[in-house]
Each structure stands twice: as C-alpha cells, then as structure tokens.
A protein has these predicted regions:
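Anionic, Ser/Thr-rich low-complexity intrinsically disordered regions
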Residues: 1-78
Length: 78
C-alpha cells in the first residue's frame, strides 16, 4: 500500500473516530441525565454510574486514538 493510500485510510479512520467520539459524548450526556432522574426518584444509581464510567473510559480511548491518528497524519505531511 502506497503512502497516499495509507494517508487516505488514516483519514477515513479519523472520520470514523470522530463519529465514535460524538456518539460516545451523546451517550455520556444521556447517562448523566438518567443518573440525575434516578437520584430525583430515590433509586439506586450504582449500575448507571458503572456504565457512565465505562463510557468515559471509552471516550478516553477514542480521544487517544484520534490524537494518534492526527500525529501520524502530521508526520506524513512533512
């Protein structure tokens, strides 16, 4: 695979990663709302909070992947 093809593939991965980040942020916002409603209703939030932590970890992983892709793309542009 040539340099140009690799760069195109990395750009596609970057677009996909950006989509995953946006989706993950949306899920996190919804999960926080769910936790808030549970608190207001006096319900347990343990499972919801564990889910939120997992979503936040996923977001961190996606953001790390994005930084890595951007670094590689910058290197290829030199």
């Amino acid at each position: 695979m040539g340099k140009r093809a690799v760069t195109e593939l990395e750009r596609k991965h970057l677009v996909e990663t950006d989509r995953h980040i946006a989706e993950c942020k949306n899920y996190i916002a919804k999960q926080r709302e769910l936790i808030e409603r549970a608190i207001q209703r006096g319900r347990s939030t343990e499972v919801a909070e564990t889910t939120l932590e997992a979503l936040e970890e996923s977001l961190g992983a996606f953001e790390g992947r994005r930084r890595s892709l951007l670094d590689r793309l910058k290197e290829r542009e030199r």
